[in-house]
Curated annotation (Swiss-Prot):
SUPFAM superfamilies: UDP-Glycosyltransferase/glycogen phosphorylase. This is UDP-N-acetylglucosamine--N-acetylmuramyl-(pentapeptide) pyrophosphoryl-undecaprenol N-acetylglucosamine transferase. It comes from the Bacteria. One of its GO terms (molecular function) is undecaprenyldiphospho-muramoylpentapeptide beta-N-acetylglucosaminyltransferase activity. It is found in: Cell inner membrane. UDP-N-acetyl-alpha-D-glucosamine binds at residues 13-15, 125, 162, 190, 244, 289. One of its GO terms (cellular component) is plasma membrane. The keyword Cell membrane applies. Pathway: Cell wall biogenesis; peptidoglycan biosynthesis. It comes from Neisseria meningitidis serogroup A / serotype 4A (strain DSM 15465 / Z2491). It is a peripheral membrane protein. The lineage of its organism: Bacteria, Pseudomonadati, Pseudomonadota, Betaproteobacteria, Neisseriales. The gene is murG. Its main location: membrane. Signal peptide: none annotated.
Length: 355
């Protein structure tokens, strides 16, 4: 049985899980073995087994803002989950652990530290999460997607994204020959964003019919009917879907995206080369989505529109002032931020640490 065994630790959100899956693919393509440490009753428990990866789980949930009882139980829970993680590491003879963030990352990383197993961490956001901040003290390598997430030199690798997104043609090639209305993609994540679903149709209704962009709007789970009804009631044409299964084509065909500013979204926008109107989720931990958005805005790859300032009138004003030339410039600037070999860079760093 050749190859080394790596334990990936990631959970809670797609922003942690999908970059880790990209690294898992890279490790396996090099002949190594991968197991996954996640939380019980979690998103990763539903997603990871679909990729033919062995999933081990711990009974742990977050503690930030989750009540006094859970915080009082934390020392006992941490002791128990660290012991369980140690058993998992021993059972599978793990030679290196890679932490991507989420509640499960800390006990898994602490277990590795106590057993003398090398730790690599990868931070997806512009503001490092709590688990990764703690583990960075013990990590053999600290890798990150945004320049100021950590001060460790040589760790900037970007966020792993799917190769088919990175392999899209450059913006100038995609935009060539486009005429007529702008085509705008609206995505609020898999669950949708109610504020975008409400405000975007209202903003379009304020524009003259001949100035309205062509819209492709992902509603999010369970929200398609109400979104389509809002567009219809306002007399605005839009193509609405509950969930976009082919994001590669959606990115390829769009001139601009209206979206949140999660780490995975920013990574995909830069990999594809697409400008965006970014409306950060205001309740994200440490307001990391605003920091993520600033990364693109500082490169003149889009606009940051705080949710508190998002009104139909403001959005209509912005959309009315856009043209394809500006969208192309934003798209080209976004593409310059891409680090397309991120998954391989993380995998190679971990392999070196396990040597």
């Amino acid at each position: 049985m050749g190859g080394k065994t790596f334990m990936l630790m990631a959970g809670g959100t797609g922003g942690h899980i999908f970059p880790a899956l990209a690294v898992a693919d890279s490790l396996r393509a090099r002949g190594h073995h991968v197991i996954w440490l996640g939380s019980k009753d979690s998103m990763e428990e539903r997603i990871v087994p679909q990729y033919d990866i062995l999933l081990e789980t711990l009974a742990i949930k977050g503690v930030r803002g989750n009540g006094i009882k859970r915080k009082l139980m934390l020392p006992f829970t941490l002791y128990q989950t660290v012991r369980e993680a140690q058993q998992i590491i021993r059972k599978h003879r793990v030679e290196c652990v890679i932490g991507f963030g989420g509640f499960v990352t800390f006990p898994g990383g602490l277990a590795a530290k106590l057993l003398g197993v090398p730790i690599v961490i990868h931070e997806q956001n512009a503001v490092a999460g709590l688990s990764n901040r703690h583990l960075s003290r013990w990590a053999k390598r600290v890798l990150y997607a945004f320049p100021k997430a950590f001060s460790h030199e040589g760790g900037l690798v970007g966020n792993p994204v799917r190769a088919d997104i990175s392999n899209l043609p450059v913006p100038a090639e995609r935009f060539q020959g486009r005429e007529g209305r702008l085509k705008i993609l609206v995505v609020g994540g898999s669950l949708g964003a109610d504020v975008l679903n409400k405000t975007v149709p209202q903003a379009l209704a304020l524009l003259p019919d001949n100035a309205r962009p062509q819209m492709y709007h992902q509603s999010g789970r369970g929200k398609l009917g109400s979104l389509q009804a809002d567009y219809d009631a306002l007399g605005v044409q839009a193509e609405c879907v509950e969930f976009i299964t082919d994001m590669v084509s959606a990115y390829r065909d769009a001139d601009l995206v209206i979206c949140r500013a999660g780490a995975l979204t920013i990574a995909e926008l830069t990999a594809a080369g697409l400008g965006a109107l970014l409306v950060p989720y205001p309740h994200a931990v440490d307001d990391h989505q605003t920091a993520n958005a600033r990364f693109m805005v500082q490169a003149e790859a889009g606009l940051l529109l705080p949710q508190t300032q998002l009104t139909a009138e403001k959005l209509a004003e912005i959309l009315g002032g856009l043209n394809r030339e500006k969208c192309l410039k934003w798209a080209e600037n976004a593409r310059t931020l891409a680090l397309p070999h991120s998954a391989d860079d993380v995998a190679e760093a971990a392999i070196a640490c396990a040597a």
